[in-house]
C-alpha cells in the first residue's frame, strides 16, 4: 500500500527532520525512512535543528534525540511547541520513566527508547502522520496497479 498526502501527492514530498548528534544514528534512521520515500533532513544538534525548522516551512515530523550539544532535545521541543504542532518523536537512550513523562508533558507525540527497531520507528512515523491528517492514506489505496479512492 502506498501512502499519499491529501491531494494525491506521494509521501516523498513529506519532510522529516532527524535530529541526533550521532551521525551513524542519523544515517540509520534516514536509510529506513528514505526506503519509504520520505525526504529526510538532518541536524547534528539542537541549534542546527531549530535553524532548519524555521527555514523549512513544510516539515511534517521531527525525530529528536534528547542528549545533544548546544541545545538539548527538551529545549528544542519547548521551542517548536511555542510555534507549531508538528508531530515530534523522541528517540533517545534516556529510557527512565521520568524522562518519558517529561517528554509527554512537553508535547511529544511518541517516545522511543534506544535500542529500538527501525521498522517499528517507521511504522510509528506513518501512524502519526495518518492520525494528524498529513496523509490521505485512509482515502487512497493502491495495490497491484489498482487505485481505490474511498472519497470518490
Predicted feature residues:
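Short, Lys/Arg-enriched segments at the junction into DNA-binding effector domains
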Residues: 14-15, 127-152
Amino acid at each position: 500500500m502506498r501512502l499519499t498526502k491529501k491531494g494525491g501527492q506521494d509521501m516523498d514530498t513529506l519532510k522529516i527532520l532527524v535530529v541526533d548528534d550521532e551521525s551513524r544514528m542519523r544515517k540509520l534512521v534516514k536509510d529506513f525512512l528514505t526506503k519509504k520515500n520520505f525526504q529526510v533532513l538532518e541536524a547534528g544538534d539542537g541549534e542546527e535543528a531549530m535553524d532548519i525548522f524555521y527555514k523549512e516551512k513544510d516539515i511534517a515530523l521531527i525525530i529528536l534525540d534528547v542528549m545533544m550539544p548546544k541545545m538539548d532535545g527538551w529545549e528544542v521541543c519547548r521551542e517548536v511547541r511555542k510555534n507549531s504542532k508538528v508531530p515530534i518523536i523522541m528517540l533517545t537512550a534516556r529510557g527512565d520513566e521520568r524522562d518519558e513523562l517529561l517528554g509527554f508533558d512537553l508535547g511529544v507525540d511518541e517516545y522511543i527508547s534506544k535500542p529500538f527497531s527501525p521498522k517499528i520507528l517507521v511504522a510509528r512515523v506513518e501512524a502519526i502522520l495518518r492520525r494528524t491528517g498529513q496523509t490521505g492514506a485512509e482515502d487512497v489505496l493502491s495495490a497491484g496497479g489498482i487505485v481505490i479512492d474511498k472519497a470518490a
